[in-house]
Amino acid sequence: MIFKLNVRGAILVAAAITGLVTLASPARADRCDDSAKELTNQVERLKVNFRAANVVYLSHPAAKELSVGCRGDKYSIELYAKGDRKPTPEFFSLVGSMAAIVFTVTKDDTTTGATRCLKRMGLLRGDKVVMRYRRLNMECTRTKTDASIAITRGKDE
């Protein structure tokens, strides 16, 4: 018995299998997109502004700037918030609830850490405070007009 090789049929079958495999696999969203979507669903008055590279920019009335960044060279995910020089309790609550959702830590812990970091800035410690609280790296900076906090988690954690 001699088998005849049908090239057209083989190519057609291979193309059909490839098409089925690509259609069957679900499209995966980026972790930044997932985090931003979860934040907007759970935090009131929070809106997504736009996405640029690995950063999703958000807006809220209690903060001047908000962003969620993913996959930096030294961190796996970052939350950045900027507010007035003297942050309000609403700002502390916003940062705490956002960090709790992004980093899956309790809201009390993240609010306490953010409050400690932002309140340590002053005459004795200066305008830049770096601290670690509950496996989160917090860096608070202050200028003449505003104060900001960047909360990150390292790649190895």
Predicted regions and their residues:
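Bacterial N-terminal signal peptides that target proteins for export
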Residues: 2-14
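Cleavable N-terminal signal peptides
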Residues: 16-17, 27
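Sec/Tat signal peptide C-region and signal peptidase I cleavage site
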Residues: 23-29
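Short glycine-rich, low-complexity/disordered patches
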Residues: 27, 48-57, 104-134
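Extracellular/mature segments of secreted proteins
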Residues: 38-43, 76-81, 124-128, 147-152
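Long, charged/polar, surface-exposed segments that mediate recognition or autoinhibition
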Residues: 70-121
